[in-house]
């Protein structure tokens, strides 16, 4: 069952990073955002483009986490936390993350 969560979480992360002027990968590489253990990204830089990206990515993640939580009868915070732990663990060396 956990593999199912992780697959859905991975899909949420992928879809939430598509079709942005600044992509999530670009923002991470530039040190503009970082993953957090709570499953959401946090801004490192405070410019308008970065803040918009953070807002959009986190909104998309919230929707996907809620879908996973609803379909598995668990709390959204638990889904987000599992995703956050995975995303931080998978972050390439040099990427920013917050505890």
Please place each PLM-identified region on the residue numbering.
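Bacterial N-terminal signal peptides that target proteins for export
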Residues: 1-8
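Anionic, Ser/Thr-rich low-complexity intrinsically disordered regions
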Residues: 2, 21-99
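Cleavable N-terminal signal peptides
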Residues: 8-9, 19
């Amino acid at each position: 069952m956990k593999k199912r969560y992780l697959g859905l979480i991975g899909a949420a992360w992928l879809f939430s990073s598509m079709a942005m002027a600044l992509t999530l990968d670009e923002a991470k590489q530039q040190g503009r955002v970082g993953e957090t253990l709570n499953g959401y990204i946090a801004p490192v830089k405070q410019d308008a483009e970065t803040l918009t990206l953070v807002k959009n990515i986190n909104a998309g993640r919230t929707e996907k986490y809620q879908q996973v939580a609803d379909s598995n009868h668990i709390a959204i915070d638990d889904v987000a936390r599992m995703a956050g732990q995975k995303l931080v663990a998978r972050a390439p060396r040099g990427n920013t993350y917050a505890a």
